[in-house]
């Protein structure tokens, strides 16, 4: 039984491109070794009329004892190694950020509230000690005015550097000593603080009549001492009460004036 060679195609079908190239190889190949050698295809299909014997070039067939793992029908894909690395890095970064935020919150709490021991000792001392004569006490007989209480800073807790900075309006210690530390004391912040006789308003604050505190505290003290003299004094004075916001604005204006006075004069570029 003779098999048809690749150079002689069968009569009933059209020769393929490979067969035509094999037949015309002598026209474009000069070496006889290359002409006599036939190149096998990369992937050989099933046994055909041109293959005298079957040859498995892709490896031995799988044994029946080791079946192939069937693919799961679910569309869920396994995560890639690089995605696992990115997920772990993101998780570690979030954990470190949360830890830093917790540390920062604890530091701020310690700065503004002090240590827990100081808070406990100050609360115990405030409950045992009577109220200071110049301090502010909440009225017990007026429950409807509880929502309108004036905010008074507590001075029992130890002051931190940030609190000293804000209490002294950001000024240097030398300038605070020159101006007088009593001007920046917490007692002067309350609504019942009144200017001392003989003191002049700071420079840059405007008229002397504007640098006045609320007359509510003075009216209360005068009313406790002398009856209706407080009402007569307030009617005779006729000055409006100064709010905390307006007082802070005047302090900022005064600080800005001090800064401009200390700095060199600026020339106008217009």
Swiss-Prot record:
Compositional bias per record (Low complexity), positions renumbered to this chain: 1-16
Coiled-coil intervals: none
InterPro entries for the chain: FAM110 (IPR025740), FAM110_C (IPR025741), FAM110_N (IPR025739)
Bias kind Basic residues: ranges: 68-78
Superkingdom per UniProt: Eukaryota
Family: Belongs to the FAM110 family.
Name of the protein described by the UniProt record: Protein FAM110D
Organism: Bos taurus (Bovine)
